[in-house]
């Protein structure tokens, strides 16, 4: 697939160790290969690029890949949307409304969030489900961007172990960001609802839109520490 200008390698990437060969878990609508790096059974799966126009999350995911991510990683789940610079996939479906959840509905809550013809109708969603089957994680970290920076965990603190709570709170304090339990509006067919239905812990990391590459690079090392801590402990739903 053509290289995205956004993902041109900064010079310092040249010294990074070459990542292990990826495992293909599917193809996009346009036939782009959807790769899972570091494929193994693990406590954590990291995903970037669910929404193609959220370039900050995609860039940070590729930084993680180049630096060596402690957990299995899909750096860009929606390469077609990234190339087209749009939120949706090539069929104009919001992949974060296309997951098979109890609350999935064919009726969009907003024209911006088209859910697709059926749950998991999109090949990118099917690739994500294949990655889940391969990794068997208990926690998912999804990298997005929004008008402000925060980490959303759709579970109260009491449902997390002391270790997992500490990992998130330490990172939030170090990065100066807020922890939230909800984005504030209904999201049927989204990853949070999927996580609740499947007894998974889902962390959605919203990066402020418009952050420079340098600002995103400054987040890399603290985020690698968070990922190592999340991968070091298995979440058990109450």
Question: Model segments located where?
Answer:
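Conserved beta-strand scaffold positions in the cores of enzyme catalytic domains, especially
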Residues: 22, 36, 73, 140, ...
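Active-site beta-strand termini and strand-to-loop segments that position acidic
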Residues: 37-41, 196
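Short, electropositive, low-hydrophobicity segments enriched in small/polar residues
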Residues: 35, 52-56, 61, 85, ...
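Short glycine- and acidic-rich boundary segments immediately preceding or forming the N-terminal edge
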Residues: 1-35
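Active-site-adjacent mobile loop/cap segments within catalytic or ligand-binding domains
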Residues: 151-152, 184-238
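Active-site/substrate-binding loop(s) of hydrolase catalytic cores
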Residues: 27-29, 40-177, 181, 208
């Amino acid at each position: 697939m053509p290289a995205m200008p956004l993902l041109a390698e900064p010079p310092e990437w040249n010294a990074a160790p070459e990542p292990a060969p990826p495992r293909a878990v599917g193809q996009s609508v346009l036939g782009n290969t959807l790769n899972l790096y570091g494929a193994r059974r693990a406590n954590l799966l990291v995903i970037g690029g669910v929404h193609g126009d959220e370039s900050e999350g995609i860039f940070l995911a590729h930084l993680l890949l180049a630096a060596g991510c402690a957990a299995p990683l899909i750096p860009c789940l929606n390469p077609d949307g990234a190339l087209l610079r749009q939120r949706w996939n090539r069929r104009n479906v919001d992949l974060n409304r296309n997951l098979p959840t109890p609350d999935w509905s064919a009726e969009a809550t907003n024209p911006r969030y088209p859910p697709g013809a059926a749950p998991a109708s999109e090949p990118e969603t099917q690739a994500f489900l294949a990655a889940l089957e391969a990794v068997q994680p208990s926690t998912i970290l999804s990298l997005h961007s929004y008008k402000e920076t925060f980490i959303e965990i759709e579970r109260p603190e009491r449902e997390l172990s002391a270790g997992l709570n500490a990992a998130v709170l330490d990172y939030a304090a170090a990065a100066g960001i807020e922890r939230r339990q909800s984005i504030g509006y209904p999201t049927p067919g989204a990853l949070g609802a999927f996580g609740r239905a499947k007894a998974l812990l889902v962390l959605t990391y919203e990066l402020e839109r418009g952050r420079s590459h340098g600002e995103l690079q400054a987040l890399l090392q603290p985020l690698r520490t968070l990922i190592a801590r999340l991968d070091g402990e298995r979440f058990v739903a109450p």
